[in-house]
Amino acid sequence: CALPIWKQLTTEYSVLTAMNGIEALAVLDNHYVNLVVSDVMMPQMDGFELCKTIKSDLSYSHIPVVLLTAKTNIQSKIEGLELGADAYIEKPFSVEYLLANISSLIHNREKLRQTFAKSPFVAANTMALTKADEEFIWKLNDIIQANLHNPEFSMEDMADALKMSRSSFYRKIKGVLDLSPNEYLRLERLKQAAQLLKEGKSRVNEICYTVGFNSPSYFSKCFLKQFGVLPKDFIG
């Protein structure tokens, strides 16, 4: 007897299970999840409704969704993709094929994140794969830009400004960018510094304080670690 699909996925991943879409949303509320694999046919809340809820709710909209279905008609496939499914796999399929899809989605997201983190002029909204995520990043960046000069500006201030709980805010930033809120704030300070250095109108020490660092030496150390070059040697 073949093992259930979720059991076969445990060879590669830590797997959490749910019997239907309602249970799945409860799991997402209580755990940090990288990806959802869902059957379309489920009681209470089916896979289409689950996918729609995930992709339209800011708490989960960054999570990739793979839908599995016995429906082979093209209309069902179109419906799944229109609801935001990242992959749509028809039964029967091999677990190897499912694993390849999961791996591809996770690794492509990881490549995007690395490019964003290491490239001074790549904006955070390139990481947004849904409308909800894009709006979230725009709002967050407006708040950060308005407070960039303030070295005391913190994760708590960001969460309060967005009217989110600390835990929801942390999980959202981590899910979209794979950074903690404080890491992201520091990265945005450094990206703004790179922009100012590119414009060439201010000295390094002035830029350091403009973007909210207290210490020029610490600023230079962070800049070097992030972008592989010292601020004084940086040419945009």
Regions from the PLM with identified roles:
Residues C1-L3:
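Short, small-residue-biased leader/transition segments that mark boundaries at the very start
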